[in-house]
Amino acid sequence: MKYDALAIEGEVLDYWDNNSIYKKIKEKNYGKKKYYFLDGPPYTSGKIHIGQAWNKSMKDMVQRYKRMKGLDVWDRAGYDMHGLPTAHKVEAKFGIKSKDEIPNFGIDKFVDECRKLALENMEQMNADFKRLGVWMDFENA
């Protein structure tokens, strides 16, 4: 029998989701000694890359270890949504060559496009990190 990573990993992820395993682990350790994990956030200016996947997997490993030791792990996912990387993506999308062109485009419209891009990418990143098996509080990211 050949190992089929996609099939088996999908089954494991489905099992965790269908049986609320993350929630049960959080409830099991609730009120015990606290461990605060501050997620050094990726930018939401694009899709995840291998470095972010590796980084988040390593963080997940540390948090799982702390949970296995019985600690109540605070594990909210975080994202860096500050302006520059996102603004550059929006400028490229709309062909804006200079910051001086933004008022003509519309400042409110530009800010809305930046917000939309950041939130869309955050949602996709949440899904991608979950697909990697990362257990973090993505609901409150």
Residue ranges and their predicted role:
Residues M1-A141:
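N-terminal, positively charged nucleic-acid-binding surface of large information/translation enzymes
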